Amino acid sequence: MTKKRKHQEDFQKVKLKVGKKKPKLENATDTTFKTKAIQIPEQLKEDGMLTTQNRKLNIKDLLSQMHHYSPGVKQNALLGLKDLLSQYPFLIDAHLSNIISEVAAVFTDKDSGVRGAAVHLLQFLASKIRAEQIAPFFPLVSAHLSSAMTHISEGIQEDSLKVLDILLEAYPALLTDRSSILLKNFVELISHQQLSKRLKSKEKLSWMLSVNPNRRVTSQQWRLNVLIRLKKFLQAVVDGSNETEDEGLQEQKDSPHSVRNPIFISWKVHANNQQHIHLYENGGLRPKMSSSFRLRSLASVMDSAEKGLSSAENLKGFIEIIIPLLIECWIEASPAQSAPILGNLLESDCQQLMQQVLSIIHLLWKLTKRHDETYKMEVWLRMNYLVDFKHHFMRNFPYSLQETVKHKKKDSCKGNKYCTTSSNNVDHLLLNLTLCDIMVSLASASTLQADSGWLDMIRNFVTDTLQDGSRLNSKQVNRLLGVTWRLMQIQQNKVATEPLIKAVYTLYQQRNLLFPVRTLLLKFFSRVYQKEDSKTQRIRSRSKVLSRWLAGLPQQLALLGLRNPELSNQLIDIIHSAASRSNKELLQSLQATAVQIYDPLGGTLVLLPAEAQRRLVQLVYFLPCLPTSLLACLSRCCIMGRMSSELAATLIGILRMRSSFAGWKCQVQDNAVNDVDYFSFLFSTLIGFSREELTSLQGIRGKPHISQTQLSPVRLYLTDLDQFLHHWAVTEVICHSLSTIPSQSQCFDILQTGICKYLVGLVVIPDSTAGSVLCAINKLLDQACILSENLHKFLASCCYSLLYFLLTLDKEDAEHVQKRDMLWGSCISALALLPRLLRLMLQSLQVSRICREELPVVAQLLRLLMQHGQLRSHMMTNEFLVQQIIKDIMTLKSGEVQEQWLTDLHYCFNIYLASHPQGPSPMNAVY
């Protein structure tokens, strides 16, 4: 076989017959295997939480679709992103950087649908993201907003205002920090630079209003939309300033950044070293910073261009640009020269534009007052803009709104000065008041003669508005009072100021004024009064209207009551300020209405909160005199519990200072309290109940209100714990006041006479009254005092009734258990000071008249009296009486099994009395 044939045999294909299987090779691999199906009912939960409701796209997919070329895909991505974030809010914090950057990037998208979806998403995010969270990304947001505001497309510019609204509402402080760029954008939205060959310097390029016919709205409406946002932006700048003011109603202080923090000092607490007084701002361990300066890091130091309106140079530059543009807007909207002069009627749209123009100027004027050299700034404003303002603004002053009037009657407009009313949220009165506020800020006392013409117009308008009687809102009244105050500062003679004060008082006398309006009027009058009172006596000229207003404040306070606590607090502050200055008219009025204010049933004192009560109590010190009727009211206020015991103590201390027993070394003022009335007040407050209340208690019988015993004619009325504790605290203060009276014997005689006249003979006496009487006796008793027989018997009956009540008291009665220490101490002290009192009480223990159930109580009382160290000697003196009482008890218990209490009584008698131990034992009674 040839070599060629052998070679072909190696590559010859084996032909298999049909139906025959191919034989397996020797080195073949078995590839057969078995499988089972795996069912996955749902995806992983983590991935499921990242999907939207329908499209199963997570947040990364949605953010990536924001770069798609199709507007529909981007719009759907924004809508899906809003749905996803509303369903899973925690994704906002995790992907905040990407979300903010992608949403801000579509502010300048060409498609309006995409921009609208972005605005809705931004509105949603603003309610979820805090200012400190978005602060690191806000420069990026501000840059995209600036690009949108200066975009060539009109639609993008219009939508940028919507974005601006959201950011102004949610993050005003962050937005105003970048005011230098945004203010220029506002200017470019309504104007363009006027290029002229005659202008050689580029720094003096002027601006003129632009007209774009391609916009969907008119040029005037577009300017109105932009100016509304500019006003909001400037308002945010003003609000973000450290210095705050109230439209000229706040007082000018030596330090504009000073803060008043009054400190309430309790001398009782201070005397015990429990309260430390810091007289100065940084007197504490931690200094309290009250500064207008804010510390910044070196990396954030800004140059003058980045300071925005906080720089006087930048503020002047912006005013020079915007004021001419605002004047052009005003000229377009102002009435035509050929229009009738009657009322200077304005269309609604024109009036809105004029209102925004004046509001922006007013805010700029406020910003000029925030700088150090305010006077120089005012001179600069007057020199540059007074002529234009007089020519354009004051020419048709005052302005009113033109409306379509249905002529149903021929004389329908006779009763109205301007024949117009406000509608469509247009406030023509606020327009006029804003103009007045701007103009009066350009005037001063030195320029009064030159400005007298237009100042008289403003003064007449303000006076007519105040006297018109129409209902004014708080914003109008605030601006109105600011103008009034400025007019009074420009011309300070009484001839000019008195009509203005009278006009304000006419408005103040109206009924049903809103609370903010009433508050503003009170602040105005208070400031006028303080300004007038600060003048020296030589140049002071009292305003009759102001005196009439001050005289009416106490009566208003008495009638107001609890209907408006905030207004009552303001009235109290003003009354207190005038009373401390010894204003004659106010003190006379306060004296006349004092009984109504301090009425214990429905007076202002008992109705208002604790802080207001404290201020009213302090007013008592300034009253010219304190008659009997007023002292009776004050006594009832102290004991009724409608004010705290600490405040009652303050009131008692004030009355002591106004009495002849104050201990002044020199005569500082006439004694406002009669001595008889003063003692009557102290005694009535000590008793704690009026005569009518004590009379009504005599008919009460039985438990749980009455504690009675057969051995004492006095029954105890059990008071509530709160009433008892309040009465006891007041009693301690009364006892202290009585102890400061120089003649103690005479004071004791007066107290003894009062007790014998009003208490002796009563069957039912409150437990707090009995304890208070014993406490006062213990405090005032000395060797020169002589007690009458009736008082001795009364006190002995009170002592036994109180001791019987304490010994029969159930330990589970938590309310009355707390009275034990105070009442027990009073009784023991009285028995120790008055040996005859102890003897009378022992003589009254006639056990033959009592029931067997009371015998253990008498035995326990005797045992405790014998064990008490202070009473040991007195009990030994009365040994025969004690022995007789024990013998009577043994007689009643003869023939019976001797009980433990009787054994204890025998033991104590044998130990303490029968054996006559040498010296008093230190053992005290424990029960």
UniProtKB/Swiss-Prot annotation:
Subcellular location, principal: nucleus
- Which Gene3D superfamilies does UniProt cross-reference here? Leucine-rich Repeat Variant
Keywords attached to this Swiss-Prot or TrEMBL record, sorted alphabetically, are: Nucleus
Tell me the compartments it is located in: Nucleus, Nucleoplasm; Nucleus, Nucleolus
Q: Which Pfam families match?
A: Ipi1_N (PF12333)
Q: Does the keyword Nucleotide-binding apply?
A: no
Is Nucleotide-binding set as a keyword in this record?
no
Subunit (UniProt): Component of some MLL1/MLL complex. Component of the PELP1 complex, composed of at least PELP1, TEX10 and WDR18. The complex interacts with pre-60S ribosome particles.
Q: Which family does it belong to?
A: Belongs to the IPI1/TEX10 family.
User: What does this gene product do?
Assistant: Component of the PELP1 complex involved in the nucleolar steps of 28S rRNA maturation and the subsequent nucleoplasmic transit of the pre-60S ribosomal subunit.
Q: What is this protein called?
A: Testis-expressed protein 10 homolog
Organism from which the protein derives: Gallus gallus
Q: What is the lineage of its organism?
A: Eukaryota, Metazoa, Chordata, Craniata, Vertebrata
